[in-house]
């Protein structure tokens, strides 16, 4: 775009991401299972599938071959002066240097002053045969775990239900 003959942070891309933002999202979006319950109800790891191998091959090509993806490395984030990978991706999107950006929901707030309209859309399906769109709660989302030795499980459940309810009532409207 800037006419210097090389693709770098000064050009425009179709997609921008970083090491911990999109790769795992693709496997969820493409409905890949890593764990299933066996006949006894015990979670069991699944071996790598042909589908997963195909996804990884295509993602590698999408990320590293051609000039369609800007992949935010540690060096590039530092060079651009952003404090985090997430903010570097958001900044590139805000400056209209990328058409699609893989962002965590907490970063969206940084785009409130963006002049151009934007939308939050799901990752695409693996193929036309896939019945729905899928996602997951990102690794930066806190989760609650309870020790196996917990005696008052009913009380813990009540507290978690209340937190989930108020999160839905207060957080979801504030974000969306």
State what each model feature region is:
Residues 1-44:
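Extracytoplasmic/periplasmic solute-binding protein
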Residues 2-3, 61-67, 161-168:
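Sec-exported extracytoplasmic/periplasmic mature domains
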Residues 3-14, 67-68, 95-99, 114-119, ...:
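Loop/turn elements at helix/coil->beta-strand transitions in domains of secreted/extracellular proteins
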Residues 19, 103-108:
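Beta->alpha turn/N-cap motifs
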Residues 36-83:
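Glycine-centered hinge/linker elements that transmit conformational signals in sensory
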Residues 56-60, 90, 156-164:
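Non-transmembrane alpha-helical segments in soluble domains
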Residues 82-99:
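Short helices/loops that flank or line small-molecule/ion binding pockets
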Residues 112-175:
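Extracytoplasmic/periplasmic substrate-recognition and gating elements
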């Amino acid at each position: 775009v800037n006419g210097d003959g090389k693709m770098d942070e000064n050009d425009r891309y179709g997609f921008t991401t970083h090491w911990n933002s999109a790769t795992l999202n693709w496997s969820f979006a493409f409905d890949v299972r890593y764990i299933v319950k066996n006949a006894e109800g015990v979670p069991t790891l699944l071996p790598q599938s042909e589908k997963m191998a195909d996804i990884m091959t295509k993602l590698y090509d999408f990320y590293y071959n051609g000039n369609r993806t800007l992949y935010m490395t540690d060096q590039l984030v530092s060079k651009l002066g952003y404090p985090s990978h997430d903010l570097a991706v958001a900044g590139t999107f805000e400056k209209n240097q990328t058409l699609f950006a893989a962002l965590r929901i907490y970063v969206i707030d940084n785009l409130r002053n963006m002049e151009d309209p934007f939308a939050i859309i799901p990752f695409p399906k693996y193929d036309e045969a896939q019945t729905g769109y899928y996602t997951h709660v990102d690794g930066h989302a806190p989760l609650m775990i309870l020790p196996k030795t917990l005696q008052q499980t009913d009380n813990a459940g009540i507290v978690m239900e209340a937190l989930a309810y108020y999160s839905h009532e207060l957080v979801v409207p504030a974000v969306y």
